[in-house]
């Protein structure tokens, strides 16, 4: 008889129905999240597999066909970008550049008498340069820094007058700057240059009061300011970015070395190389900007002679790099 019985569906109570609905909903949420996670994983895999050329093609495609909702109206920020034109070179992300390799001599001194003798030797070399009105000399300083106590006393002065040799003077044992080094730095024929060099002179004066900052500030050259004048760029420069833009070289500005104990004697090989490269590349940058300035002044003089002052002012008023545009303009 049992096999002929028909089993009627059992009516579930409301609590059981609710629990089943909740379980079904949670299951759907889990499936949805799992699907999203899988899609994200696949996208990341594809992104990581993209070659630089593929990434560049995607960026070009996006720039050529921007989303409509972005291009439907011009915002204030977009107007300012259009008015300002392309980004300044100092703000552009540099391409992969070769690192600076310095193979010249590094002359390192820690004793007052040794520093004085070396500075006197450099000064004699400067005075022998009879064909030069000024002798450019890259100048930089290093000191220890602590987040608890702040900057320490000036510990290292490094200079470079010839790219084949850099001088590193450690001041840790000194209570006073040797007279010969002070005379070299203040020599009327020496043109000190660097990045943010005025701040270095002010710190040097604070740490060694016998060194007056103002005379040095009056005759020094800030490479960033000079670059803006010659290359018609804008903004503030770091030495690293100037090396990228002017010398087309990358610098290894290791934080470990930069924040190291510059007051401890002796300096290690990494510290010596770091100090030497800073002034070496500074000297390279100076000579390159000097060469560009010579070419620029020559081009401007020729343009004025051919087209007159009015045309020259018109071209300068375009707000574009004169060196790159001068041959394209027809008056």
From Swiss-Prot:
Keyword terms: Exonuclease, Hydrolase, Magnesium, Metal-binding, Nuclease, Nucleus, Phosphoprotein
Chain ranges of the 3'-5' exonuclease domain: 118-290
Gene symbol of the encoding locus: WRNexo
Keyword DNA-binding: no
PANTHER family with a match to the protein in the record: 3'-5' EXONUCLEASE, 3-5 EXONUCLEASE
Protein name: 3'-5' exonuclease
Coiled-coil region: none
Residues where Phosphoserine is found: 80, 88
Endpoints of the signal sequence: none
């Amino acid at each position: 008889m049992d096999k002929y019985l028909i089993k009627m569906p059992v009516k579930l109570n409301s609590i059981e129905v609710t629990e089943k609905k909740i379980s079904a909903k949670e299951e759907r949420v889990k499936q949805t999240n799992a699907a999203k996670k899988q899609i994200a994983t696949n996208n990341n895999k594809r992104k990581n597999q993209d070659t630089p050329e593929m990434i560049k093609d995607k960026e070009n495609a996006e720039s050529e066909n921007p989303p409509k909702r972005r291009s439907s109206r011009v915002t204030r920020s977009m107007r300012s970008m259009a008015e300002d034109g392309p980004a300044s070179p100092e703000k552009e992300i540099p391409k992969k550049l070769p690192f600076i390799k310095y193979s010249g001599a590094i002359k390192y001194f820690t004793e007052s008498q040794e520093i004085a003798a070396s500075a006197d030797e450099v000064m004699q070399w400067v005075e022998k340069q009879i064909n030069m009105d000024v002798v450019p000399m890259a100048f930089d300083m290093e000191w220890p820094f602590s987040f608890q106590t702040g900057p320490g006393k000036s510990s290292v002065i490094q200079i470079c007058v010839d790219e084949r040799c850099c001088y590193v003077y450690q001041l840790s044992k000194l209570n006073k700057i040797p007279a010969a080094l002070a005379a070299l730095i203040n020599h009327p024929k020496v043109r000190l240059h660097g990045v943010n060099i005025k701040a270095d002179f002010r710190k040097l004066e604070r740490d060694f009061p016998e060194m007056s900052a103002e005379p040095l500030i009056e005759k020094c050259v800030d490479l960033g300011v000079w670059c803006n004048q010659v290359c018609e760029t804008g903004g503030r420069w770091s030495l690293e970015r100037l090396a990228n833009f002017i010398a087309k070289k990358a610098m290894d500005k290791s934080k470990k070395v930069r924040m190291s104990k510059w007051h401890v004697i002796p300096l290690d090989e990494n510290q010596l190389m770091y100090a030497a490269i800073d002034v070496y590349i500074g000297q390279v940058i100076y000579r390159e900007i000097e060469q560009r300035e010579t070419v620029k002044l020559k081009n401007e003089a020729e343009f004025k002679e051919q087209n007159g002052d009015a045309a020259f002012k018109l071209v300068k008023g375009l707000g574009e790099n004169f060196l790159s545009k001068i041959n394209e303009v027809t008056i």
